[in-house]
Amino acid sequence: MQIENSGVGRILRQLRWVLYPRRCPFCDRVLGSVSACPDCKEKLETLRRRPTFRLARERHYIKNLEGAAAPYRYAGCVRRGVLRAKFQAAPWAADELGVEMARLLFGSEVRMRGFGPEVETVPGLAIGYNCVVPVPASSRVRGYNVPERMARSVARAVGVPLEPKLLVRARSGKRQEGLSFDERLVNVSGAFRVTDP
């Protein structure tokens, strides 16, 4: 039995929320007992995208990719939230970004229970999905894996397993920062491979 999903795990998470209250990943405001930041709600709506889960064949950039989704444009407070998770020693921001992704993409809800939040798993939420697979993080040391933490929050919210070892880095690439869209596509081409299941 994993501690994370046990009664002990829930108690430890509650204790964590008492000592380190939830914060908005976008503006860093302490959220207290609210499930989402009221200050960022309007800003986030302007950055909202309509997710595309099934891609038309002619829009595939990655061979055999059946679907992809990005709930927000990478700008404004969303960009600040991602940068906070990546570069400001804020693993909690990665967790909260994952919760937000699950909320927007799958309709999961954050409910306040006791001293902190519990992401409510909605049965059948992820029908058609077997697992959540994070993109492998680069080798730069942060002390935690941002994509894996985000993916763990999504997996927990939709009730499917997290499989962090299914996709591995096949080769190193340049930093994506400062590259154009086309340069980014070339940079990640062949950078990852699927492991044997």
Show which residues each predicted segment covers.
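Glycine-rich phosphate/pyrophosphate-handling loop used in enzymes and phosphotransfer proteins
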Residues: 1-197
